[in-house]
């Protein structure tokens, strides 16, 4: 049986032990002696340098700077505390002020490469004493054609069965305008036993969304100034009578477009 040049077989007449020293990638060719791997193959290459990874990881690595953009990577943070109800609320997370700083956009076009949600969902003293389970649904939505002074409400965008946010889907006549890019949830539990009065939210998503705002707006960064691809965060809780609070820090990482 043919063996690779990186394989060394050690055989002694007493112990009859066959060992392989594998210096090559497990994806290059089939092994002569089976390998017992205790970890996932995909995770085994995570902490290795790029030149020691298989060819598939070197060829299809995503670029650091999105196509059509230029560095440096800029950061915009939003700190907010919201009262999340069963009917839902909405926040615009692509408001970036125009300027020359590391947190400003240069022109009217920029690309949001990734977004980071950090914070917690919690209940007040009166609500956490009641026996109930409440889940907060988060929808990161892209509005391709923003219109009006404020975003559309949760009930105007999503179609729900029996007004339940866990069954929310974008309405059929709005599917070409609103796109759900990411969806996640957090759970809190109230009651004397098994209480979970707060839940941490820590999510990082790569989205690569190109946002366009009006060019003549010098400082204001609002939803009404968007012309293309506004990023909206819709939030709603599943319990009808017990609202929850969300203390969030939302951070977007974006690049300026070269067509500004």
Swiss-Prot record:
Q: Name one GO biological process term.
A: viral penetration into host nucleus
Q: Which InterPro entries match?
A: Gem_coat_AR1, GV_A/BR1_coat, Viral_coat
List keywords of the entry alphabetically: Capsid protein, DNA-binding, Host nucleus, Metal-binding, T=1 icosahedral capsid protein, Viral penetration into host nucleus, Virion, Virus entry into host cell, Zinc, Zinc-finger
Indicate the impact reported for residue 135 to H.
Answer: 90% loss of homomultimerization
Q: Give the main location.
A: virion
User: What positions carry the motif Bipartite nuclear localization signal?
Assistant: 3-20, 202-251
Zinc-finger ranges (unnamed): 69-86
Please verify whether the record's keywords include Zinc-finger: yes
| Any Gene Ontology CC annotation | host cell
Gene3D superfamilies reported for this sequence: 2.60.120.20
Localized where? Virion; Host nucleus
Q: Please give the subunit comment from the record.
A: Homomultimer. Binds to single-stranded and double-stranded viral DNA. Interacts (via nuclear localization signals) with host importin alpha-1a.
Role this protein plays: Encapsidates the viral genome into characteristic twinned ('geminate') particles. Binds the genomic viral ssDNA and shuttles it into and out of the cell nucleus. Plays a role in protection of the genome from degradation, virus acquisition and transmission by insect vectors, infectivity, and systemic movement. The CP of monopartite geminiviruses is absolutely essential for virus movement.
- Identify this protein by name: Capsid protein
Give the taxonomic lineage as stored in the record.
Viruses, Monodnaviria, Shotokuvirae, Cressdnaviricota, Repensiviricetes
